[in-house]
């Protein structure tokens, strides 16, 4: 399991296994990636990725007004930086 931050400050936890396509767990507003801990434990034998959305948990917030597009761009940047080609 790898934890880290992207260049723009997104905190993530990546459990890379032989199964090449990770399951991505995205929490809601007001929560953190830790809300998914039971599911992450259940899927520990599979590749999975969880992260804190902008301004939540250990992820930074780079601007005051955040849109849904910003959350989408955050995920795209994360999977690009981790060189993930496909996700569930």
Predicted regions and their residues:
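Alpha/beta-hydrolase fold catalytic core
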Residues: 1-23, 44-47, 77-80, 84-86
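Conserved HGGG/HGGXW glycine-rich cap/lid loop of the alpha/beta-hydrolase fold
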Residues: 14-60
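Active-site loop/oxyanion-hole signature of alpha/beta-hydrolase fold enzymes
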Residues: 49-88
